[in-house]
Amino acid sequence: MKDEIFKNEIKKQFEFDENVASVFDDMISRSVPYYRESCELSGEILARSLKEKAKIIDLGCSTAEFLIALHHKRPDFELFGVDNSESMLKIAKRKSMAHGAKIDFKNEDILNCDLKGFDCAILNYTLQFIRPIKRSDFVAKIYSNLANNGILIMAEKLIYDDKTLAAQMIEIYENYKQKQGYSAFEIAQKRKALENILIPFSETENRQMLKNAGFKIVEVIFKWANFAVFLAKK
């Protein structure tokens, strides 16, 4: 279903409700530059890096698009998805069944879920929706619970410290969204709805947070303008 949520004036903050869930796959593919390509890259790396029957948890799994892709790459993976949106999980369950993917879903706040014993954790554009004051402790929790040599994949929207560059990146990104079929009005409406909901860090801040949590290796494996995918190894 095509994302047309912001064609009309919105008077509430952004939330992952039934309306958003119904168009989420279209929304993220048109809103995050090279989303499918970056997920494909992350999936390829995990397929080559993780042991047989590795346990993977996607924190903020939305409609399970990434988990389903992992299932097709490595059917032996044990896959788990957590999301606090029941509407998202309803679609995720339906999609996973259609693909024959066995995925254990849980409707829960990711800050409170049990993370022990996983070989890999996924945060695909999830951390940016968590209050900044809680992020460091949550990333540290992920690190401490990952198995030895565990991997964290973390995709995030970024901000730039240089004000001129930051303004240029915003303009470039808005031009990108218009090329994806969004009107200037829709872009402005969504930006307003996301104020104080989506709060990005800089690349440096994200790197430092991962290092402070204890990760030995922190690399950016994909980047386009103000979007990046981090890979961190325990």
From Swiss-Prot:
The protein's Enzyme Commission number: 2.1.3.-
Enzyme class: transferase
Catalysed reactions, as listed in the record: prephenate + S-adenosyl-L-methionine = carboxy-S-adenosyl-L-methionine + 3-phenylpyruvate + H2O
InterPro entries: CmoA (IPR005271), Methyltransf_25 (IPR041698), SAM-dependent_MTases_sf (IPR029063)
Keywords, in A-Z order: S-adenosyl-L-methionine, Transferase
One MF term in the entry's GO annotations: carboxyl- or carbamoyltransferase activity
One BP term from GO: tRNA wobble uridine modification
Tagged with keyword Manganese: no
Residues bound to S-adenosyl-L-methionine: Y35, G60, C61, S62, D83, N84, D109, I110, N124, R191
Transferase listed as a keyword: yes
Pfam families: Methyltransf_25
NCBIfam families: carboxy-S-adenosyl-L-methionine synthase CmoA
Subunit: Homodimer.
Record family assignment: Belongs to the class I-like SAM-binding methyltransferase superfamily. Cx-SAM synthase family.
UniProt function note: Catalyzes the conversion of S-adenosyl-L-methionine (SAM) to carboxy-S-adenosyl-L-methionine (Cx-SAM).
Protein name according to UniProt: Carboxy-S-adenosyl-L-methionine synthase
Originating organism: Campylobacter hominis (strain ATCC BAA-381 / DSM 21671 / CCUG 45161 / LMG 19568 / NCTC 13146 / CH001A)
